[in-house]
Swiss-Prot record:
Pfam families, sorted: ApoC-I
UniProt entry tagged with the keyword Signal: yes
Molecular function GO terms recorded: fatty acid binding; phospholipase inhibitor activity
Keywords attached to this entry: Lipid transport, Secreted, Signal, Transport, VLDL
Source organism (scientific name): Arctocephalus gazella
Transmembrane segments: none
Key word Transmembrane present: no
Physiological role: Inhibitor of lipoprotein binding to the low density lipoprotein (LDL) receptor, LDL receptor-related protein, and very low density lipoprotein (VLDL) receptor. Associates with high density lipoproteins (HDL) and the triacylglycerol-rich lipoproteins in the plasma and makes up about 10% of the protein of the VLDL and 2% of that of HDL. Appears to interfere directly with fatty acid uptake and is also the major plasma inhibitor of cholesteryl ester transfer protein (CETP). Binds free fatty acids and reduces their intracellular esterification.
Protein family: Belongs to the apolipoprotein C1 family.
Lineage summary: Eukaryota, Metazoa, Chordata, Craniata, Vertebrata
UniProt-recorded name of the protein: Apolipoprotein C-I
Matching InterPro entries: ApoC-1_sf (IPR043081), ApoC-I (IPR006781)
């Protein structure tokens, strides 16, 4: 009984696959795709620029750079003092 039902389903699926894509799903022409490449690249560049600017502004406004700088300064001074006391 299962084989009797699965064969027609298999035939219908095979027919749909062999039919190919519908006209609305067909790939666009190469020339139209090539014409849109500069616009897409410009849009990508603008988006990337905006995101980079936003990230840089976020970093500038955060306390992370100042905290990092202070930590490095403190650590460097501690190491310098330890070296002075060790080799003096």
């Amino acid at each position: 009984m299962r084989l009797f039902l699965s064969l027609p389903v298999l035939v219908v699926v095979l027919a749909m696959v062999l039919e190919g894509p519908a006209p609305a799903q067909a790939a666009p022409e190469i020339s139209s795709t090539l014409e849109r490449i500069p616009d897409k690249l410009k849009e990508f560049g603008n988006t990337l620029e905006n995101k980079a600017r936003a990230a840089i502004e976020s970093i500038k406004q955060s306390d992370l750079p100042a905290k990092t700088r202070n930590w490095f300064s403190e650590t460097f001074n501690k190491v310098k003092e330890q070296l002075k006391t060790t080799f003096s």
